[in-house]
């Protein structure tokens, strides 16, 4: 079930939206034209969840709320208590990045938001979006250099395995290069996927290209440093989904 309702009178213009998924529902409400607040509720069963959602929607309509659509630029933000959740993700993100084990994990470091770097980037990105939409490539550089104090080291075209391994093992300010490389790539993945999760879009095809390159380098580093015996299935899934998103949404 999903319903979006709007109430207007001479003094106010408010929206209220509810959506169910399994035994959870999300309520998103506030002044129309803003992103409002998000709250997730959980029930013992899908039936109990659906029943309560229907009851709440009916009560709103009795108060004068009527069916309406959200503005096209409506943004989606996670509920702090529940964390990553499809119900607080943009419909476009849910369509193209559907694997919950890959896109909603908070502990798997191969996923977009499961590493500390990825989680911190998403948190900063949500704060940025609440103020004004950031330019994603500028935002990534700001997080890495401004918030973390690291050098910004994007993947290099045609870099050999030997060159990448040497870069990863070279020490800089007491840390091996791999620390900076992974920080860059995890921030890039989280920022690009996070922008789609929040707003349903990125700035350009170049953002998707950067995210795919970041995922590829994370995978290469893991094998070059013998952290993994084979390419990552998770990272392959992310690259595949990013490619499909770019192709089907007609990014330029």
Question: Which residue stretches match the model-derived regions?
Answer:
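A charge-rich, low-complexity, intrinsically flexible signal that marks solvent-exposed coils, linkers
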Residues: 10-12
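Intrinsically disordered, low-complexity charged/polar segments
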Residues: 63-75
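N-terminal leader/targeting peptides and immediately adjacent processing regions
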Residues: 73-126
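Amphipathic alpha-helical elements of HEAT/ARM-like alpha-solenoid repeat scaffolds that form extended
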Residues: 180-200, 239
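Eukaryote-biased recognition of C-terminal alpha-helical segments
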Residues: 214-252
């Amino acid at each position: 079930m999903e319903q979006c309702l709007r109430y207007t009178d001479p003094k106010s213009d408010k929206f209220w939206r509810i959506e169910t998924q399994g035994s959870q529902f999300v309520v998103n409400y506030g002044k129309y034209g803003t992103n409002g607040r998000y709250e997730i509720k959980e029930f013992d069963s899908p039936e109990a969840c659906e029943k309560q959602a229907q009851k709440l929607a009916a009560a709103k309509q009795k108060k004068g709320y009527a069916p309406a659509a959200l503005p096209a630029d409506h943004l989606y933000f996670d509920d702090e208590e529940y964390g990553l959740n499809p119900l607080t993700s943009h419909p476009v993100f849910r369509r193209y990045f559907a694997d919950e084990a890959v896109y909603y994990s908070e502990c798997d470091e191969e996923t977009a938001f499961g590493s500390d770097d990825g989680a911190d980037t998403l948190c900063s990105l949500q704060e940025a979006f609440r103020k004004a939409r950031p330019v994603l490539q500028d935002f990534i550089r700001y997080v890495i250099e401004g918030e973390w104090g690291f050098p910004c080291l994007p993947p290099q075209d045609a870099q050999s395995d030997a060159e990448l391994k040497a870069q990863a093992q070279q020490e800089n300010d007491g840390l091996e290069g791999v620390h900076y490389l992974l920080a860059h790539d995890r921030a890039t993945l989280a920022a690009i996927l996070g922008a789609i999760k929040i707003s349903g879009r990125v700035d350009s095809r170049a953002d998707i290209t950067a995210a795919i390159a970041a995922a590829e380098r994370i995978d290469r580093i893991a094998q070059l440093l013998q952290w993994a015996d084979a390419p990552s299935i998770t990272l392959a899934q992310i690259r595949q989904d990013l490619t499909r998103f770019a192709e089907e949404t007609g990014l330029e």
